[in-house]
Amino acid sequence: MAFALTWLPNALKAAGLKVEVQRGWETRGLGDMGIVRGVMCHHTAGPATGNMPCLGVITNGRPDLRGPLSQLGLGRDGTYYVIAAGKAQHAGKGRWQGVTTGNTNFIGIEAENRGIAADPWPEVQMLAYRRGVAAILGKIGVGAIMCCGHKEYALPLGRKSDPSFDMVDFRAGVAALLTGVQSVPSPAIGDSPRPILRRGAKGALVKEMQAMLGLPQDGIFGPNTEAKVRAFQQAQRLSADGVVGAKSWAALDGAFA
């Protein structure tokens, strides 16, 4: 029997986000959710490489903590992984806006990041984080204040440090999305915006990017292209996430002008 959060994939897709559902997600959970009151943000503190290396642990749990450990995972490339439609063990003891039953009333999002300065958050991932949270809060009809970080919820204060970014700024971005002020990032006047490219993309823009990087121009963003993109990003001191967004396009334009 499916649990209650079967609306999650459609809500995220409606916000223009990339979504992958995991096998068995509809019936996965430690019982059903209560009334969904908000969203709790986490980071995985996992490996330095890979798009979503902690997916298995989040899905199946650890020896000391039964899974699922959140309803959603968020990869470094901005992909949402729908893991569970039921309750997950992500919150623990704490309090936010009067809610003390985090596992029952908050949807958990585990975003892939080590949570240290050496692992900066990719722009594409942070944009997806804000948009995904806004999509969920809009669906349940509450404001941005009902998004909290694990570090804000957990008691005693200081028990948790995730997520590593500033939650006040994050909520401001979510609030802007909810009010329609910031539905999508706007390019500067005179810019010619180009879409974000990631593994799986195909077409003329992929060929253009491959030419800039000295790669065979087959127009397919596969693993070899991703590896070259990561190496270029690292050389340019950008987040080496293998995703070509606004900053990477600007760096490519500057390097190969």
Regions found by a protein language model. Give the residues of each.
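Conserved beta-strand segments that form the floor/walls of ligand-binding pockets within enzyme
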Residues: G73, G108-E110, P216
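Acidic/polar residues in short coil/turn loops that connect beta-strands
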Residues: G75-D77, D218, D241
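Acidic, Ser/Thr/Pro/Gly-enriched interdomain connector segments
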Residues: A176-P223
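Fold-core signature of tandem repeat domains
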Residues: V206-M209, F221, F232, L238, ...
